[in-house]
């Protein structure tokens, strides 16, 4: 995911999601990079500007850690709220990072995890509609369904971003770097 001239800890990047047809779906400004490795990127944003494909703009309400991995067809947004931590997991292509932004294709399906641990698979109808409209291949469908199972396994077993330590470690690192800015 990274190259030598890529962003470093404390740098800010833009995140762009696209749809399968190549159209821009959504843009997040100003996500602080907390960690990069050959395979993954962890970042955080708080009250960042989001621009929708139709031009609407809004500001996020709470701090959110973001996790992208080059081998998995999902990304994970950890929302840190007063009533607890919740997760919004996008089924999406592995992200690529270039000089402009971190980019991925959003494949509509989402898994939401509530602070009480309840899980919900969202936007199944949207996935089916877009799959028909844009002709998602059988391979894409198989990959995404497999990655839903991987993601649920991570959730059930507290792996990676779903571990208790993840939020504490990475949100504290974000606060520390923010104080240095």
From Swiss-Prot:
Any one GO molecular function term: nucleoside diphosphate phosphatase activity
Record organism: Ligilactobacillus salivarius (strain UCC118) (Lactobacillus salivarius)
Record bears the keyword Hydrolase: yes
Role: Has nucleoside phosphatase activity towards nucleoside triphosphates and nucleoside diphosphates.
The keyword Hydrolase is annotated on this UniProt entry: yes
Active site residues of this protein: 26 (proton donor)
Database matches in NCBIfam families: PRK13662.1 (NF010183)
Enzyme class: hydrolase
Similarity annotation: Belongs to the Ntdp family.
Keywords, alphabetical: Hydrolase, Magnesium, Metal-binding
Protein's name according to its UniProt entry: Nucleoside triphosphate/diphosphate phosphatase
Listed EC numbers: 3.6.1.15, 3.6.1.6
InterPro entries for this protein: DUF402, FomD-like_sf, Ntdp-like, SA1684
Reactions listed under catalytic activity: a ribonucleoside 5'-triphosphate + H2O = a ribonucleoside 5'-diphosphate + phosphate + H(+); a ribonucleoside 5'-diphosphate + H2O = a ribonucleoside 5'-phosphate + phosphate + H(+)
Cofactors: Mg(2+)
């Amino acid at each position: 995911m990274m190259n030598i001239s890529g962003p470093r800890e404390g740098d800010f990047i833009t995140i762009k999601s696209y749809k399968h047809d190549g159209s821009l779906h959504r843009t997040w400004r100003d996500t602080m990079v907390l960690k990069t490795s050959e395979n993954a990127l962890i970042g955080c944003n708080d009250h960042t500007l989001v621009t929708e494909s139709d031009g609407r703009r809004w500001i996020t309400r709470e701090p959110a850690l973001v996790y992208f991995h080059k081998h998995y067809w999902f990304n994970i947004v950890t929302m840190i709220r007063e009533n607890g931590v919740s997760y919004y997991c996008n089924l999406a292509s592995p992200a690529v990072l270039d000089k402009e932004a971190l980019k991925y294709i959003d494949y509509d399906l989402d898994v939401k995890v509530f602070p009480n641990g309840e899980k919900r698979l969202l936007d199944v109808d949207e996935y089916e509609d877009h799959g028909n409209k844009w002709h998602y291949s059988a391979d894409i469908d198989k990959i995404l369904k497999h990655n839903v199972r991987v993601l649920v396994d991570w959730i059930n077993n507290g792996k990676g971003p779903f571990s208790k330590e993840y939020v504490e470690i990475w949100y504290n690192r974000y606060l520390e770097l923010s104080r240095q800015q």
